[in-house]
């Protein structure tokens, strides 16, 4: 059975149904070379023009962001982490959110992991040069597309605590 998925490439948003296995979405996507969308709609980022297709194969590397809805993965595999509030730029996108890493690793360690897509929680997603932003609980960012990463706090936050308030 398929599930809805929204992903963002450099020039469009892709919305459709994908066939994925059980487990965390990030694990599933990181194992694929091509993501196949069924009943897909592509919306151009520049003018909003939409095109619908029955089936669309997208090379995983072309995707910049993937929205995560509902999938939290196996609770048994979770481990204690600290959060780092960071702003990343990838393609036309600017994302501010929390990266998670084990307490004993270096800052921004999540961006040097083996996984192509890494999760960012409490994310605010926008495009460079545009004012509109969207908030998402979790997005997966393609770390190979990141051109800049800027920490927003010098001190990481224990993930068991709520994130610090953002300055106005």
Predicted feature locations:
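Conserved RNA-binding domains used in RNP assembly and mRNA/RNA metabolism
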Residues: 1-168
